[in-house]
Amino acid sequence: MLKKLYNSKSSKQRNMIPVFKPLIQSSEINAASKSLKEGWLGMGKYVKDFEKQIEKLCKIEKSKSVVAVSTGHAALHLSLKLLKIKKGDEVITPSFNNTADFQAIKACGANPVFVDIEEKTFCIDVNKIENSITKKTKCIIAMDYGSSLCNHKYLKEISCKYDIPIIHDAAHSFASQYEKSFIGNQHQFTIFSFDPVKSITCIDGGAIILNKKEYENKAQAMRLIGMNQSAQLMYTNNRAWTYDVLDIGYRYHLSNIHAAIGLEQLKKIELIKKTRQDSFLQYNLGLKNISWLSTPEENIKNKCPFIYTIRVLNGRRNELRTYLSNLAIDTGIHWQPGHKFKYFKNERKHNLQITEKISEQILTLPFHTYMEAEDIDYIIKCIKEFR
């Protein structure tokens, strides 16, 4: 039984039930302390161990490589740079996506091309991609959402047909499976995020799964501001004092302390997955007969759900948010679509009818490993009493 973070008293006495809460326990604190006491604060042996454990847990194919980096955004940016995405290029991605994806594209001088999503899954609508492809299209970024996975089979067909690489943004789907294969094995590039709110956290961190050995060597240098330092040497808590710089680089490496925390998190993946699956099913059961609300699809076998998002169908989403906040229940909105931000409003886009509708209805409820059945019962009760 996990220690409760909030009590079960009246709403006036309750602590706010947060949308997110990372599972940080004594093991993570001890691992961080041990790493600090060892004195090697940069990239070192724990980073190597973290990469190997991801490889093992996700059953990454032998032809692929894992490169740990500082954030999920860093993983996206490096993936695009490895593909030589440049000014004037276009990258197809759903407008209903995280801002990190759009900013990574812009950081390369390229432009996002916004396409619509599927109403059922909130993932990229694969049937809308081909009409957006031009001679400038150099990449497609597809992101899994919440507990839903993209149609990766059809994405691979599009990739092969047009010779356009896929970057799979799997920030939401770490440790999940698609057609019996773990996420990380579907496309040329897969990126993970281990930020403070993800199912698995390094406090901040990320990783790229690469399908070519040459990409691995380049990514290892690029994450170290372009220095061709031997990764294998640094993985022994050491470094070379002579090296060369052969390409552009960034300060995107993962530190030992973050990797040490991540290693402890990976040991708890089955606990994290099970508690999230249980919470997901409890929410769906309790909310299924409310006429003005729709719940996410229930196909969560072999998945590790990241967020729990409902749709408020009566136009009163913001009223419901205020009502729940007054009852000590925090909520979120994932996300505001990219084409509505000032910085991206002039980017090329096609019919975004589903994106427009969904973005006005979505509401993310509290969903994390510390939650217990009584917390979810309380949230369900409050939603049912909303008038």
What does each model-found stretch correspond to?
Residues 1-41, 244-246, 366:
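N-terminal "arm"/small-domain region of PLP-dependent enzymes with the aminotransferase-like
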Residues 10, 47-53, 60-64, 127, ...:
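PLP-dependent aminotransferase class I/II
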Residues 43-90, 104-108, 114-116, 181:
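Phosphate-binding glycine-rich loop
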Residues 67, 92, 113, 166-167, ...:
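Structural detector of well-ordered beta-strand residues that form the stable sheet scaffold
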Residues 81-161, 165-170, 177:
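PLP-dependent aminotransferase-like
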Residues 117, 196, 367:
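Short, conserved catalytic or interaction motifs in soluble domains
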Residues 168-202, 217, 241-246:
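Conserved active-site segment immediately N-terminal to the catalytic lysine
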Residues 192-193, 206-212, 263:
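Short beta-strand-to-turn element immediately C-terminal to the catalytic PLP-Schiff-base lysine
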